[in-house]
Curated annotation (Swiss-Prot):
Region Interaction with substrate tRNA, annotated ranges: 37-40, 161-165
Subunit composition and interactions: Monomer.
Residues the entry annotates as binding substrate: 14-19
Domain of life: Bacteria
Catalytic activity reported: adenosine(37) in tRNA + dimethylallyl diphosphate = N(6)-dimethylallyladenosine(37) in tRNA + diphosphate
Cofactor entry: Mg(2+)
Species assigned in the record: Nitrosococcus oceani (strain ATCC 19707 / BCRC 17464 / JCM 30415 / NCIMB 11848 / C-107)
InterPro entries hit by this protein: Dimethylallyltransferase, IPT, P-loop_NTPase
KW Translocase (keyword) present: no
Record function comment: Catalyzes the transfer of a dimethylallyl group onto the adenine at position 37 in tRNAs that read codons beginning with uridine, leading to the formation of N6-(dimethylallyl)adenosine (i(6)A).
Protein name: tRNA dimethylallyltransferase
């Protein structure tokens, strides 16, 4: 019997093989999977977010996938509330919550809580977008560095979504986003969390995996998927969903701002930058099981160590 019910966090950078490992573990573990991915929440964004197929989602219970229209917004605070509700229900069913993804802010918010942040303000965001169109996102990143140096250090100047959010929070609250997050009230999760980190030992290997996956997405019809979103008059680059890595670059290609080769190059580069940020977050994690997806027996390694950790948690 578990003193506190267990929960497994399967974390890793993009293209590390988290979904495949999660499904392999689900074959052996009585669990339900909770997606920790800020883009997989959106309906109609399947190829570019590498969602598991509907057949796999029916075979292995998944949560927090396809819960919003791309015109809607999602937040770390809402994720925390949704995840806690799901984890409680899954544990009551006698199963283990298996949280899988690469949105590290969501994992952090779930673990430590988060200061109440203001909801997105369309007028403020539109004003920031107009300023970015005139001055460029690099200029706005420089302004962010003056207002919130800590946030600017963590946010790359090619990450307009996070630059916009940090500036928006400052305009709405008068306080830096980094300060609000740092002051978030730590609240211990009522779970025995087992952390599993999946990442190649060599960054060059991850870079290669990222490029292969994006080119496979293109062959699978990614541009056609984005065209379907592009044709909707209610969607634009002002929406968080469309600013997701890969989608933003494809959108600009459809607006004739990029050539096809440039679009692919920019998308791959942006994905590598995202992976770099994810790895920075992961380096802060302690007491985690580390697995290299390039090892032939990495599934067995992960299972053996996870099984041992679950025994110790009981």
């Amino acid at each position: 019997m578990f003193i506190r019910p267990p929960a497994v966090f399967l974390m890793g950078p993009t293209a590390s093989g988290k979904t495949e490992l999660a499904l392999a573990l689900a074959e052996r573990l009585s669990c339900e999977i909770i997606s920790v991915d800020s883009a997989q929440v959106y309906c109609g964004m399947d190829i570019g977010t590498a969602k598991p197929s509907l057949a796999l989602r029916h075979r292995y219970p998944h949560h927090l996938i396809d819960i919003l229209d791309p015109a809607e917004t999602y937040s770390a605070g809402r994720f925390r509330a949704d995840a806690l509700t799901l984890m409680k229900a899954i544990s009551k069913r006698g199963r283990i919550p298996l949280l899988v993804g690469g949105t590290m802010l969501y994992f952090h918010a779930l673990t430590y809580g988060i200061s109440p942040l203001p909801p997105a303000d369309p007028e403020v965001r539109a004003a920031i977008d107009r300023e970015a169109n005139m001055k460029g996102w690099k200029a706005l990143h420089r302004r962010l560095a003056e207002l919130d140096p800590m946030a600017a250090q963590r946010i790359h100047h090619h990450d307009p979504q996070r630059i916009q959010r940090a500036l928006e929070v400052f305009q709405l609250t008068g306080r830096p986003l980094s300060e609000l997050i740092a002051n978030s009230r730590e609240s211990e999760l009522p779970y025995r969390v087992i952390k599993l980190i999946l990442a190649p030992a060599e960054r060059i290997v991850l870079h290669s995996r990222i490029e292969r996956r994006f080119r496979a997405m293109l062959k699978a019809g990614f541009l056609e998927e984005v065209k379907g979103l592009f044709m909707r008059p209610d969607l634009s680059l002002g929406h968080s969903s469309i600013r997701a890595v890969g989608y933003r670059q494809a959108w600009l290609y459809l607006q004739d701002q990029f050539s096809f080769p440039t679009m692919a190059e920019q998308a791959i580069s942006a994905t590598r930058q995202m992976a770099k940020r994810q790895l920075t977050w992961l380096r802060r994690e302690s007491n985690a099981i580390h697995v290299d997806p390039e090892e032939k027996d990495h599934v067995e390694q992960a299972w053996r160590q996870l099984e041992m950790a679950l025994v110790q948690a009981s």
